[in-house]
């Protein structure tokens, strides 16, 4: 296992809830909002932030930490134009760098290939969305094997999904429904059925 590299930092301020379009009654509840990330919107911008370090086996590794104030979770939208299949991509949080989601560059390329085979040639088809980290920070790490130059990487993170609802807690309505359901099942232990 490799030690997590020191991550460059990208910080977004608090999400203005006034700009969030809330869900209409009777429709699925909106729990997150797409946010533009100017600091990493292009491959050139992202490339300037990578702080490449040599790995023990002779490859290179770098990481970037994205922080969105007030978020209960983050998903990074990684726009892939060129990614070596031999690369390893990891997602974790700075608070728990040992809890890692890891995927090969090849697996990401196959997901994108399926999107394009279905007829979608847009940037959306070339975007891989990371899993939700469950907190307001997400670290994207890329490891390149020996012999693969950093210039072989052409990715950007133009957007992230800012989860603004705490999905581990019930909404007020869900809580009230739980309370009502509990009342139905309440009984006094001294009231026994004599049948």
Spans of features found by a protein language model:
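Domain-level representation of secreted and single-pass membrane ectodomains enriched
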Residues: 1-195
């Amino acid at each position: 296992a490799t030690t997590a590299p020191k991550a460059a930092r990208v910080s977004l301020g608090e999400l203005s809830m006034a700009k969030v379009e809330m869900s209409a009654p009777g429709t699925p509840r909106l729990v997150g909002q797409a946010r533009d990330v100017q600091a990493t919107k292009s491959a050139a911008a992202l490339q300037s932030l990578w702080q490449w370090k040599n790995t023990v086996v002779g490859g290179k590794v770098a990481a970037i930490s994205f922080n969105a104030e007030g978020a209960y979770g983050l998903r990074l939208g990684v726009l892939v134009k060129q990614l070596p299949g031999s690369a390893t991509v990891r997602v974790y949080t700075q608070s728990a760098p040992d809890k890692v989601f890891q995927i090969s560059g090849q697996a990401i390329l196959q997901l994108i290939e399926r999107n394009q085979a279905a007829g979608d040639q847009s940037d959306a088809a070339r975007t891989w969305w990371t899993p939700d980290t469950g907190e307001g920070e997400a670290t994207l790490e890329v490891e390149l094997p020996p012999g693969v130059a950093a210039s072989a990487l052409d990715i950007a993170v133009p957007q992230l999904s800012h989860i603004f609802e705490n999905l581990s807690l019930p909404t007020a309505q869900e809580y009230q429904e739980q309370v009502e359901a509990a009342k139905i099942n309440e009984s006094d232990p001294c009231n026994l059925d004599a049948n």
